[in-house]
Amino acid sequence: MYALITDGSIAKYLSGNRGIQVGDIKYARDIYSKWTEAKRNAIGIYEVIQNDTKKKDEKYYINTDQTFTYDADAGTVTATYGDATAKAHADTTWTQDEIDAGKAPAGADTDTVAAEGLKTIRIRLVKQQAANILKNTDWYIVRKADANTAIPSAITTFRAAVRTKCAAMETAITNASNTPAIETLYTYVNTADEGDPVVVERPLGEFPELGS
């Protein structure tokens, strides 16, 4: 991404994939690939520097729009984010004022969920993961019901382990006190002692694999 500077301020933003006219002169799009940065700067075109210092994971936060700043002394154009807002970790319910104003669906009361929080969303995803894993061995259960063929003990043990891990994950998510705590559960870190081989894990853990 580029910016065109005119009279000391940003005049327009450029994608860098098409030609441009600056003043009375038309330039082909190859100025973005063949020209040096200094040469582009001389006609007022600057590559935008992305400052992602305050940008956060959009699974857990709502980032602000970027603010673009031209620094004439430094000869740079920088795009920066403001402070991100954490997404709600708990469900929000309709308020009486919203219900009275007709904003809520028919039949809703102050206990009706208006928007799901991250806890609800993440717990549902964990349940779906567990269901998808168990689905691969469901045929053993069907065969047992249809033909009374014994289910291998390894399969029984594995399926129980999946359900146990699912319950543990749900508990961890439920107990997370805020959005940063939920994010931490999913953040992979090196848990090995210094000098030992790297072991990358997340606090939430992983579902067991069959045969492991």
Residue spans for each PLM region:
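A preference for well-ordered globular domain cores
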Residues: 1-212
